UniProtKB/Swiss-Prot annotation:
Top-level taxon: Bacteria
Name of the featured protein: S-adenosylmethionine:tRNA ribosyltransferase-isomerase
Keywords: Cytoplasm, Queuosine biosynthesis, S-adenosyl-L-methionine, Transferase
InterPro entries, sorted: QueA, QueA_dom1, QueA_dom2, QueA_sf
Gene Ontology MF, one: S-adenosylmethionine:tRNA ribosyltransferase-isomerase activity
Organism: Chlorobium limicola (strain DSM 245 / NBRC 103803 / 6330)
Subunit structure, as described in the record: Monomer.
Compartment list: Cytoplasm
Length: 343
């Protein structure tokens, strides 16, 4: 199996450039992974496909102000995206433009020094006056939006590129599967006996990096910090014991849970779980925790598409994607959603 096996043609007009006028009004394609059969519904009707005793897992990470422009002394503009502490290193930025070690940049009257180029468009910066780089971004930067939207961030993005339950600052991209979740829908789920719990995974560098190799074995996933409270772990155990299903809202939740479940003490620990998830999930992977997955329609050749294929089955997923394109579903972050039902 090769990366090219997960390629498909995504028409440009299928990409949702803006959020829907009202949160929660998007469409929902429901896929049965056992048969490959599909059903067409609405995100607001999610409760119709779940049952009392099920548990919905949400990522409560909050998108931070991380995108800022600086200029070189030549006048050239450089786009900077602040990354969270990554593999033990702080003050990393993803940059667009040409930089080398020793370059000096000006951003909002502050001088920044390029301390190191770490590769793949990533640099380590410092402020010349010794001030804190994250605080500089918090004062002057904007909430980043995905580059495939092909537009500048607007006022609407400050609210809509954030979930209604975002609490823990740290992501440079939203956990998009729950962008359409509303307080009303969460209340409806609760009334029907469907519980919710949260994990935190700060979406980071890997979201913006393409797969540049053809062989899965050669691709290296970047690490993303996650934390799972013990009360969430306890709810998962109780749900499983009671015959309920664990429904992951998004690939970020899935990666956090499945990485944590790889720990030898997952089944017995009475403490929170945390770490840096570098798990690469693709077809052939055996899921340990999740029983259903609510997710967006993903870009071709992406790691999140491969994770979704691992859960749904590659042919099932690609057939459903072709059907979604035929029926004019909207793709990517601000688009429609897919529910892969429990088998």
């Amino acid at each position: 199996m090769k990366v090219s096996d997960f390629d498909y043609t995504l028409p440009e007009d299928m990409i949702a450039r803006y959020p829907p006028a009202e949160r929660g009004t998007t469409r929902l394609l429901v896929l049965d992974p056992a048969t490959g059969e599909t059903e067409h519904s609405r995100y607001a009707h999610l409760a119709d496909f779940l049952k009392p005793g099920d548990l919905l897992l949400l990522n409560n990470s909050k998108v931070v102000r991380a995108r800022m422009f600086a200029s070189k002394k030549t006048g050239a503009s450089i786009e900077l995206m602040l990354l969270e502490k990554h593999e033990g290193v702080q003050n990393l930025v993803l940059y667009r433009g040409r930089l080398k070690k020793g370059d000096r940049l000006i951003a909002h009257s502050e001088e920044l020094l390029v301390e190191e180029i770490t590769g793949q468009g990533v640099a380590r910066l410092s402020a010349s006056d010794g001030s804190d780089l994250p605080h500089l971004f918090e004062r002057h930067a904007e909430v980043p939006i995905p580059p495939y939207l092909k537009r500048e961030a607007e006022a609407v993005d400050a609210e809509r590129y954030q979930t209604v339950f975002a609490e823990q600052p740290g992501s440079v991209a939203a956990p998009t599967a729950s962008l359409n979740m509303t307080a009303g829908l969460l209340a409806e789920l609760g009334q029907k006996g469907i519980d919710t719990a949260t994990v935190t995974l700060h979406v980071g560098l890997g979201t913006f990096l393409p797969i540049r190799v053809e062989s899965f074995e050669e691709h290296v996933m970047h690490r993303e910090y996650y934390s799972i409270p013990f009360r969430t772990i306890d709810k998962i155990r109780r749900t499983k014991a009671g015959g309920g299903r664990v429904v992951a809202v998004g690939t970020t939740v899935t990666r956090a849970l499945e990485h944590a479940a790889g720990s030898s003490c997952w089944g017995t620990s009475v403490a929170p779980a945390s770490g840096e998830a570098d798990i690469f999930i693709y077809p052939g992977y055996r899921f340990r925790v999740i029983d259903a997955l609510l997710t967006n329609f993903h870009a071709p050749r992406s790691t999140v598409l491969m994770l979704t294929a691992a859960f749904a089955g590659q042919q099932n997923l690609l057939s459903a994607y072709h059907e979604a394109i035929e029926k004019q579903y909207r793709f990517l972050s601000y688009g429609d959603s897919m529910l892969i039902r429990p088998m």
